[in-house]
């Protein structure tokens, strides 16, 4: 039996009007609820620490898009974007709403996603946990006042119920956990997981559908702006140095993770930052460390009885996190938007040791590497035997992009052309040999290369084309040894270098086969050795 939208809207309205539905609580009020309900503990830094239980990261296999007539032909269905039928979704949705109706307390936040007024998404977030509501308050864009919040008529609603467990046989899910996005009903339904990042990435997935439909590029990247208004974007997967390299005391942060690029320039989708906290120290990352204060949330960190935090302890997970409003960082752009990018940096951590530390890409090469989204991960064993494994994540964030990858790549190519953007591929990985033989490229040298690229000093520099990949390598960069610029020179055994490089090229080509005929033009012009 299907359930109608009228009933659904009525149930939501009823929930919002319940006397025990706490609307737009202040940070202090939410802190009190978190501590009174034993949802978290106060740390000596002023932040609260919460545990997410057994789910310490996203659950990509439990994420679905509702297959609805007006939207289904646009979505790139597959392992990442899984379909669920509308009736199955609605039955579960109403079970969740009935579950919430029986709860003693609910927490409601209204705000926005997207700092560009023309495409800003108006949000309502309904939580059963107070700390999740503080997370929403930290991560999304906050209204100026409670009065403004009351006037928000949402374009999308997040309903998050971590303690509601689905029954896969009855509810049509794959496990007790579910993240379901419906564009028709304008709902993100999350249950069975306390990992708060599902809310943030759920809205990012929605924006990655809606923005390109308006010819606006959506991007999984960090962004900053220099004193002269020059804008740089940093794309890169986990472990490539995206956060470290974009946190620059001489440049203001636009945002650390999710952005749009429209006719006016670049804008942040979020109102906060969700930083990795493992091994965090004031010495290494002072901006992030100082942002962890009253109002911030720590996830899954180890807190002693005296409130001290051990950021090096990974007993619960390597994926410890800090969620804080962007204004916890001093060096930011307000509002979080800027002009068109001058420079784009693609970061890769090549553990094979063969990709140049920096190379300049033309538009076709940029589209190729954007679609490839390459880095490498290290597979460790107890005996210490490690071999690098290539990792490809389309658009540098495959789990969050519901449309076909070429939609995003074509938009990127058009914008690079239109605004004459310089694009560089920067390898923060190994040189002189693969992992275990060579050494990690010095962060000092990487910073120097990135700074030279962003400043425009490499725009008209002298380049040489390397014979293996066909990439344009700068002949010299100030304060960087010439010997590391062309990777073959750093290897003592040149034949081993060539064999390793050829192996990586073949892996790129094999990965690109999954895109089919739609990308033949990019493969022909942008792939290696062209």
Curated annotation (Swiss-Prot):
Cofactor note: Binds 1 Mn(2+) ion per subunit.
Entry cofactors: Mn(2+)
Record keyword Transmembrane present: no
InterPro entries hit by this protein: PEP_carboxykinase_ATP, PEP_carboxykinase_C, PEP_carboxykinase_N, PEPCK_ATP_CS
Main location: cytoplasm
Binding site residues for ATP: 201, 220, 236-244, 285, 321, 440-441, 446
Compartment list: Cytoplasm
Pathway linked to the protein: Carbohydrate biosynthesis; gluconeogenesis
Binding residues for substrate: 58, 195, 201, 321
Class in the EC hierarchy, top level: lyase
GO BP terms: gluconeogenesis
Pfam families from the UniProt entry: PEPCK_ATP
Protein's UniProt name: Phosphoenolpyruvate carboxykinase (ATP)
Origin organism lineage: Bacteria, Bacillati, Bacillota, Bacilli, Bacillales
């Amino acid at each position: 039996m299907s359930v109608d939208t009228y009933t659904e809207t009525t149930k939501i309205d009823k929930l919002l009007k319940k006397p025990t539905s706490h609307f737009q609580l202040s940070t202090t009020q939410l802190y009190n609820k978190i501590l009174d309900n034993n949802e978290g503990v106060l740390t000596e830094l002023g932040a609260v620490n919460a545990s997410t239980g057994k789910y310490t990261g996203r659950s990509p296999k439990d994420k679905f898009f509702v297959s609805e007539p007006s939207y289904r032909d646009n979505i790139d269905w597959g392992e990442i974007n899984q379909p669920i039928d509308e009736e199955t979704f609605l039955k579960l949705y109403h079970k969740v709403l009935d579950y919430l109706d029986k709860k003693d307390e609910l927490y409601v936040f209204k705000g926005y996603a997207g700092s560009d007024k023309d495409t800003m998404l108006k949000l309502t977030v309904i939580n059963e946990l107070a700390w999740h509501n503080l997370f929403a308050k930290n991560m999304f864009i906050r209204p100026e006042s409670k009065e403004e919040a009351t006037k928000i008529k949402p374009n999308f609603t997040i309903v998050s119920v971590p303690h509601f467990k689905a029954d896969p046989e009855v509810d049509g899910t794959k496990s007790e956990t579910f993240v379901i996005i419906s564009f028709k009903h304008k709902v993100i339904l999350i249950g069975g997981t306390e990992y708060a990042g599902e809310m943030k990435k759920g809205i990012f997935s929605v924006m990655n559908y809606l923005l390109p439909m308006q010819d606006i590029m959506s991007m999984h990247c960090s962004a900053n702006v220099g004193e002269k208004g020059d804008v740089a974007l940093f794309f890169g997967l986990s472990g490539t140095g995206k956060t470290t390299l974009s946190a620059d005391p001489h440049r203001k942060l636009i945002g650390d993770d999710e952005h749009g690029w429209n006719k006016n320039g670049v804008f942040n989708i979020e109102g906060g930052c969700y930083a990795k906290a493992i091994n965090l120290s004031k010495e290494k990352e002072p901006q992030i460390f100082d942002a962890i204060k009253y109002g911030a949330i720590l996830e899954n960190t180890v807190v002693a009885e005296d409130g001290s935090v051990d950021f090096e302890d990974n007993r619960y997970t390597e994926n410890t996190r800090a969620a804080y409003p962007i204004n916890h960082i001093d060096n930011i752009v307000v509002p979080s938007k800027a002009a068109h990018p001058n420079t784009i940096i693609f970061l890769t951590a090549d553990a094979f040791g063969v990709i140049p530390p920096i190379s300049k890409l033309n538009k076709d090469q940029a589209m190729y590497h954007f679609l490839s989204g390459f880095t490498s991960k290290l597979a460790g064993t107890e005996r210490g035997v490690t071999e690098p494994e290539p990792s490809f994540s389309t658009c540098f964030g495959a789990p969050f992009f519901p449309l076909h990858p070429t939609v995003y790549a074509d938009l990127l190519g058009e914008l690079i052309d239109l605004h004459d953007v310089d694009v560089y591929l920067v390898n923060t990985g190994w040189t002189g040999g693969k992992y275990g033989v060579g050494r990690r490229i010095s962060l000092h040298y990487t910073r120097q290369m990135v700074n030279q690229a962003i400043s425009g000093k490499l725009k008209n520099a002298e380049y040489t084309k390397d014979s293996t990949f066909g990439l344009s390598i700068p002949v010299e960069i100030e304060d960087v040894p010439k010997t590391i610029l062309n990777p073959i020179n750093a290897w003592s055994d040149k034949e081993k270098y060539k064999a390793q490089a050829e192996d990586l090229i073949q892996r790129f080509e094999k990965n690109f086969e999954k895109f089919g005929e739609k990308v033949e033009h990019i493969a022909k012009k942008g792939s290696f050795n062209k």
